[in-house]
């Protein structure tokens, strides 16, 4: 049996044991994917026991170091790339309004964690690889560990990277528990009732909801007997006129449709734009879409799956003028958008269509609406994206005063490229849409491979370090790095910014890129969308900062000696 085959068998054993450990939960909290790390540590520890090591030597059972290295790096690449593809479209949209505040708090948590690490490093003379590993474990961030190992190796400390894995593993358990503890302490300090927080959040969401619909009866005599396109601000594309009801007849309005008093228009847009149009046109006549029992006008949702229309602007497709169908709104990666002539369609866009059933059917055949295509993965863009990400990660970034160039590395490069490509959506016939199930599968495979190798490398000396004086100290250092930044940011967010508690919980989980903590935050109050929204908003920027932070710390502290 070759060393490569033996290595793959051992990795499979580690992954199986680790995933089983991760599924064990105590009061709803478990190691989750972090169990793979401890599966690797256990297997590695057993393999290094004198009797087992002697037996393996006799039977010539050895692990192939090159295979382990490749599996570790490729697993990391898969993990960060799929994260970028998943959150890319929503990330740029989330940077508006409240997203800026949330990301500022997330950046504060990251920077405070780095500051705590540097202070502990100088106070207690902790080895540099160890404090970087403790930092990564304390914030439960695997890409951070990968970036730290890479920069330490490039600085000439490749032999010391094992310390990083041990520091990561020792600090990791409290990294998970510490986030939950911070959420509980903030709730206790401010005497918060989660059910009231959910009510406040729901009210705020209704007030700020992206797009809404309204019926407006034309009572302004200045609008009587003019064309739809002559309405003030029509060309700004801030609202969509999806239906017109005249007496008992329901029709699709066109730019050249003549308007009369007592006509009722159904408009779609943000609340500010709708209020403005109400002042111009007349009085509100309800919010429900206009319907008539025997009307042929229907509405339907359809998904863009035809590669021929991906990347084409709505002006080129002329859907309203040719097919008498209105696109009232477009849902892209969970973000609702007002259609405009200059907007280009992307694979996976969900269109809200209004028109006659026969005309809608024609539009459906044009845009695709093939649900099975949403389950297919186009592999060519995946490898193009990974290749571009690795190239970007290899470009040196020279900063004044730094002895070596920084790099985005194998963790940062693919992440940045994936975010950008997911935002672009498609180039020609290449589209970067990935079905959620496929994305999750690749992401889980990547993180399992990476953590399996990290665990194997860390396992040889893990238990001896854990049971030593250093082991207990490292746990304490990790607890400080975990808890202090979270409490400071959480208290500031609540006391000064009056941030919703459920949003704070999502912020803390996202700033630590901690999925188990998000699950805990969701369990605080059922049907809680606040935590998920905050988590998704800060996750991409946090991951990027977590990747860059250990590199900055490593270069600065290495140069200081």
Swiss-Prot record:
Pfam family, one: TrkA_C
Domain of life: Bacteria
Gene Ontology BP term (one): potassium ion transport
Residue ranges of domain RCK C-terminal in the record: 198-283, 285-369
GO cellular component: plasma membrane
GO MF assignments: monoatomic cation transmembrane transporter activity
Keyword Cell membrane in annotation: yes
Subcellular localization: Cell membrane
Membrane topology: Multi-pass membrane protein
Record keywords: Cell membrane, Membrane, Repeat, Transmembrane, Transmembrane helix, Transport
Classification via InterPro entries: AAE_transporter, RCK_C, RCK_C_sf, Transpt_YidE_put, YidE_YbjL
The keyword Transport belongs to this UniProt entry's keyword annotation: yes
SUPFAM superfamilies per the UniProt record, alphabetical: TrkA C-terminal domain-like
Family as reported in the entry's similarity comment: Belongs to the AAE transporter (TC 2.A.81) family. YidE subfamily.
UniProt-listed HAMAP family: YidE
Protein name: Putative transport protein DNO_0009
Gene source species: Dichelobacter nodosus (strain VCS1703A)
Lineage, broadest ranks: Bacteria, Pseudomonadati, Pseudomonadota, Gammaproteobacteria, Cardiobacteriales
């Amino acid at each position: 049996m070759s060393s490569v085959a033996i290595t793959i068998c051992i990795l499979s054993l580690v992954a199986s044991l680790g995933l089983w450990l991760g599924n064990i939960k105590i009061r709803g909290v478990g190691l989750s994917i972090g169990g793979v790390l401890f599966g690797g540590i256990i297997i590695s520890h057993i393999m290094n026991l004198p009797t087992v090591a002697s037996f393996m030597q006799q039977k010539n059972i050895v692990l192939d170091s090159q295979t382990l290295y490749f599996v570790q790096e490729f697993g990391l690449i898969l993990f960060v790339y799929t994260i970028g593809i998943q959150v890319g479209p929503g990330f740029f949209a989330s940077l508006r309004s409240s997203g800026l505040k949330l990301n500022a708090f997330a950046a504060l948590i990251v920077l405070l964690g780095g500051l705590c690490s540097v202070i502990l490093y100088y106070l207690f003379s902790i080895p540099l690889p160890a404090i970087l590993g403790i930092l990564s474990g304390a914030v439960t961030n695997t890409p951070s560990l990968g970036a730290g190992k890479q920069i330490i190796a490039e600085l000439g400390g490749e032999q010391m990277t094992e310390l990083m894995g041990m520091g990561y593993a020792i600090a990791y358990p409290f990294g998970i528990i510490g986030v939950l503890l911070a959420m509980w302490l903030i709730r206790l300090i401010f005497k918060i009732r989660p059910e009231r927080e959910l009510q406040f959040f729901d009210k705020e969401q209704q007030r700020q909801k992206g797009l809404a619909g309204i019926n407006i009866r034309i009572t302004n005599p200045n609008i009587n007997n003019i064309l739809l396109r002559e309405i003030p601000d029509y060309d700004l594309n801030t609202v969509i006129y999806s239906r017109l009801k005249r007496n008992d007849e329901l029709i699709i309005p066109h730019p050249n449709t003549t308007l009369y008093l007592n006509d009722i228009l159904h408009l779609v847009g943000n609340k500010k734009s709708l209020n403005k149009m109400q002042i111009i046109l007349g009085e509100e006549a309800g919010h429900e879409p206009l319907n008539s029992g025997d009307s042929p006008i229907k509405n339907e949702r359809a998904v863009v799956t035809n590669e021929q229309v991906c990347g084409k602007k709505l002006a080129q497709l002329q859907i309203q003028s040719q097919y008498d169908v209105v696109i009232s709104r477009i849902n892209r990666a969970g973000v609702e958008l007002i259609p405009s002539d200059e907007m280009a369609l992307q694979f996976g866009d969900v269109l809200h269509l209004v028109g006659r059933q026969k005309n809608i059917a024609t539009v459906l055949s044009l845009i695709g609406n093939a649900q099975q295509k949403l389950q297919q993965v186009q592999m060519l863009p995946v490898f193009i994206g990974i290749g571009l990400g690795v190239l970007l990660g290899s470009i040196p970034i020279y900063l004044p005063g730094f002895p070596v160039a920084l790099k985005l590395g194998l963790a940062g490069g693919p992440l940045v490229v994936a975010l950008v490509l997911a935002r672009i959506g498609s180039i020609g016939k290449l589209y970067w849409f990935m079905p959620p199930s496929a994305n999750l599968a690749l992401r889980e495979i990547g993180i399992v491979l990476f953590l399996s190798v990290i665990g194997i490398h860390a396992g040889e000396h893990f238990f001896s370090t854990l049971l030593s004086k250093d082991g207990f100290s490292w746990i304490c250092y990790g607890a400080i790095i975990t808890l202090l930044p979270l409490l400071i940011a959480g208290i500031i967010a609540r006391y000064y910014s009056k941030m919703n508690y459920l949003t704070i919980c999502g912020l803390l989980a996202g700033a630590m890129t901690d999925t188990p903590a998000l699950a805990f935050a969701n369990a605080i109050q059922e049907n809680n969308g606040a935590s998920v929204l905050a988590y998704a908003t800060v996750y991409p920027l946090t991951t990027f900062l977590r990747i860059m932070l250990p590199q900055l710390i490593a270069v600065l502290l290495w140069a200081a000696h």
